[in-house]
A protein has these predicted regions:
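A mature extracytoplasmic/lumenal domain signature
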Residues: 42, 56, 64, 97-99, ...
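Mature extracytoplasmic domains of secretory-pathway proteins
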Residues: 47-82
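Short, well-ordered, aromatic-rich surface patches in folded extracellular/luminal domains
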Residues: 1-19, 77-140
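A short, sequence-level motif marking secondary-structure junctions
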Residues: 33, 52-55, 106-113
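N-terminal export/targeting and maturation segments
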Residues: 1-54
Length: 140
């Protein structure tokens, strides 16, 4: 099955995630450059270089495959003008490979299949866990 997968890790180039309010995606990570920035609990912008190992990237590649990321719709945005709606958090996740790439835009107020929403949240959770682990290891 893995040999016929449309996205092969041997062709992997980079992974990136951006998230925040729809008008300002201030939280960002790019595995190609190692640029990582996020708002901490004190609302201060933290910037650093954070390089993921090949094993970390392989783990994320496999988790994305397990959760069905390659089959996610490209546009999973919610209704941002709904009366009384809280502004959603927008996530832009992209995996780049030599021959193709997959980019998904997901809003937390996306009104789709609950399984798809859970799968998106699963990919986001896995990426954040890896980033937090590597950042914690780097501080030691």
């Amino acid at each position: 099955m893995l040999k016929n997968a449309p996205y092969k890790f041997s062709e992997f180039e980079s992974m990136s995630i951006q998230y925040g309010n729809c008008d300002s995606l201030v939280n960002k990570y790019d595995s190609k450059t190692g640029d990582y920035q996020y708002l901490n609990r004190a609302d201060s912008l933290v910037k650093m270089k954070l390089h993921l190992s090949k094993d970390d990237l392989l783990y994320l590649h496999r988790k994305a495959a397990d959760l069905g990321f390659w089959d996610f719709p490209v546009d999973e945005t919610g209704d941002s003008v709904k009366a009384g709606a809280k502004q959603p958090v927008r996530y832009i996740i992209e995996f780049k490979y030599q021959r193709k790439s997959k980019k998904v835009v997901f809003d937390t107020n996306f009104d789709g299949d609950i399984r798809l929403i859970d799968a998106n949240l699963g990919v986001i959770k896995e990426i954040n866990q890896v980033l937090n682990k590597v950042e914690g290891d780097q501080k030691k």
